[in-house]
Structures are given as C-alpha cells and as structure tokens.
C-alpha cells in the first residue's frame, strides 16, 4: 500500500487546518468591513467573486503541476518532479503578473461591465478593494505553486504554517488599519494584500530550501521548458477552463443577485462566507486525493487509486455531516455577527439552512469526487460536465427560480443545488464505470 492510514492523516489534517485558516481570512475581512455598513460589505463581496475567479484559475494551474509532480514521484523520478515544479512556478508567475496588469489598468470599466446596476456607494467600495488586492496576485501565484509542490510530496504542513502567518498578518493589519487608522475598505484590502505578499515570499524561500525533498536549487530550472509546461497545461488548461467558466457563471449569478438590492447582495455574500466553513473537511480531502491518486497512477496502482478514493470520500461525508448539522441550528446566531439589516439577516438564515440540508447528501460527490478524476488525467470529462452543468443548471435554474418565479436569492441558491445534483450524478457514473482510470500517467 502506498499510503497508510497514518500517512493519509498526516496529509489531510494540515490541509483541513490550512483550509480553515484560508476561510478565516475571508470571514475576518467580512466581519471587519461590516462595521462600515452594507454598502462596504456588498462592494467587497462583489470583488471577492472576481478574485475567486483569478484564484480558481491559479488553483487549476497549480493542480496541473501537483498532478505531474505526484506522478513523477510515484515513478521515483525526483529530478523530473523538481523540474516540473519549477516550471509550475514560472507559469503561475507569468499568469499572475498579466492578471495584475489587466485588473489594475481596467478596474472601474471591468466592474461596471460585470456589476453595472449596483449602487454608486457599492461601486466605489468595490473599485478601491479590487485595485489594492489585485496588486498581490503575483505573490498569491508564488504561494499556490509552492503549496502544490509541497503537497505533491505529501507535505501539507508547510502551506498550513504559512496560512497561520497569513492570518496573523491579516488580523493584525485589520486591527491597525480598520480600527486604529479607520481606513475601512482600504484597510481590509491592504491587510489582505500584505498577508499574500508575505506568504508568497516565504513559500518561495522554502521551495528552494533544503527542507524540500524536490527542492529547486538552481535558476536553470525556471527557464521555460515546453516539454514540462505542456504536461502541466494538459491538466491545468482544462481545469482552468472549468474553474474559470464556473466562476464566470457564478459572477453572472451574483450580477443577478445584485439586481435584487443591497440587502440581498450582502446576505448572499455572508452566506458564501459561512458555508465555506461547512465545506472545509470535504474540500481538504479533495486536495489530498490529488496527491494520493496522482502518486498511485504514477506507480501504476490503479486499484489503490480507486480504493483510496472510496475511503477518503467516506471520510469527507463524515466531516460534512459534522459541520453542517451544528451550522443548521446556529444559523441565526452566526448571521447576527455581521451587523446586517433585519431583511438581510432573515435572507441569510434561510439560505444557510437550505444549504446545510442539501450539502449533507451531495456536496462531496459534486466536488470531492472530481479531484481523483483530475489526478488520473481525466480532466476533459470533468471540464465538460462542470461547464455544461454550470450554464444549463446553475445559471439557467437561478434565472428561472430567482427571477421568473420571484424567489430572489433563495431561487439562486436552489439553482446552485440543482447544479450540484447534476454534477454528482455525472461524476458517480464516471467513477463506477472505471473509464477515469484509462487515461494513464503523464509522467
């Protein structure tokens, strides 16, 4: 067996803690900015959807690098794993610099194009937050690349420790900039940017350090090599298209929510912030499966890949139930933390409880199960399913339930649940068929 129960726990537990810390950054930002009113909350929320789009594409490219690195490690070819890790750093740095230049150059036009109907006070907050946070994209890219490299060798403690650093800087920065200097949205944005800059620098140092089994110890590794880049992009491009289209679809849905008013936009933002906590166990196990299945495929152990997927998926359900049941009963109490209006608070409680019930049954199948398919190289299937389901079910159903039937934000969330159900059915069928194991190793 490639991974003992102890090995899996050593990989998964730090990932869960890392995901918790990542979610806390968003929660702290939302709580801090809520002191400045619903317009500030809504403005930050709108930009966070664009930031998520950029981050998801980075994560997709990082996934490509992690899969290739893991498969080389499974074959025992550490030097080639080292080279592919360096190429991942190069690809992500180029992408993130381009995104920063574009975002800073076209901040207001881009926001107006996507969210043109929002109130002017919300737009002003969004412009300020977007411009500052966009400057940190290159450092976020460096962090994502490094985290993927360390996860590929089964070391998730590094990214966990850096997440702790990010949270300390973010909380301290918020306390200083928001409460002492009274910079409101600008203070929250600056804290987030500084935490990302610090994480990127520290991660880059560690990637090149002796503690990394596949350390990148020479500048020659960073010179673009199409042979390795092609392998990374074989996974990264379909995953990037999938994640990108997924987030674009979400942006369209958020634009739809924005037409329902500031209370609905704020409630939707708070809802997404809170549900991230419920998703932590299943999301962490999905990340772990990229490493586990990737190494199994690289070693030619397809039976073990299937066995570990079933085992970790079962664990993800246990974690999902452990988080969602308490959140269902605490929804009202949690919503009260965000200083929302009575209308926004009621909307938040309703959508949270609906999420908690539905998530118990289909969230892990919809999201955790897709990662083993990606790690095996079956990325075109996951991309096709995710894109079709997003546009046909999430966007289409959101419009029908939210606008046509007049259910507002609740209708949009029902559309999201329909999307999950469709994805779950497709991924389960693919997994049972065994066709996802036919792609073979990229290494």
Can you annotate each of these PLM segments?
Residues 10-29, 132, 165-166, 195-199, ...:
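Transmembrane helical elements of multi-pass membrane transporters/channels
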Residues 62, 132-151, 159-167, 188-203, ...:
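Short runs within selected transmembrane alpha-helices of multi-pass transporters and secretion channels
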Residues 38-49, 126, 130, 189, ...:
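Small-residue hotspots at the loop-to-helix junctions and early N-terminal turns
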Residues 1-15, 69-136, 169, 180-237, ...:
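Short alpha-helical transmembrane segments in multi-pass integral membrane proteins
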Residues 41-101, 140-159, 265-331, 363-387:
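Small-residue-rich hydrophobic transmembrane alpha-helices
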Residues 19-23, 56, 96, 100, ...:
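Residue-level hotspots within the lipid-embedded alpha helices of multi-pass solute transporters
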Residues 24-42, 111-120, 176-185, 244-277, ...:
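Helix-terminus/linker motif at the lipid-water interface of multi-pass membrane proteins
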Residues 3-31, 35-36, 52-64, 68, ...:
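N-terminal transmembrane alpha-helices
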